[in-house]
Amino acid sequence: MANAIIETAKERFAQSHQSLSREYASIRAGRANASLLDRIQVDYYGAPTPLNQLASITVPEARVLLISPFDKSSIKDIERALNASDLGITPANDGSVIRLVIPALTEETRKELAKEVKKVGENAKIAIRNIRRDAMDDAKKQEKAKEITEDELKTLEKDIQKVTDDAIKEIDRMTAEKEKELLSV
């Protein structure tokens, strides 16, 4: 039963890491990356639809994204969604495809993005600590219900803290890696 609490916490930590990884992938680092467009929703026939379901996204050059809509009639909707997004990149529509030229990051923009990375990393740490709190509460409930002894509770709490520390170290590593990527020219 005690192992189930730790396994559940580990699974939730892994989900947090995956979520953080996706979040970091969508923060542009001066290079074209199709994951920059993962959060773009296009109003397609009145329904919000993810861009990657309406078009193929390729990277023909280091700083260029090429969006080729499956349905050419959706090109205006896609362009409208890109203009409305917070990417800060103006799409170039040539009638059949849309080109996004990723501008080189200025020093100021790099620092702003690094701050954003730290903020996102801090939010991930908060999520990890909330998961730890839930696991500790579950352990205390088991001890109250006399399913585990007080000594087992102390051991379980130490184990939960150890996996929590490991999860936070991983977040710190991911954050430092993304910051390094952003700040290197």
Swiss-Prot record:
| Key word Protein biosynthesis present | yes
Q: Which protein is depicted? A: Ribosome-recycling factor
GO MF terms held by the record: ribosomal large subunit binding
Q: What does this protein do?
A: Responsible for the release of ribosomes from messenger RNA at the termination of protein biosynthesis. May increase the efficiency of translation by recycling ribosomes from one round of translation to another.
Q: What is its main location?
A: cytoplasm
State its location(s).
Cytoplasm
Q: Which InterPro entries match?
A: Ribosome_recyc_fac, Ribosome_recyc_fac_dom, RRF_sf
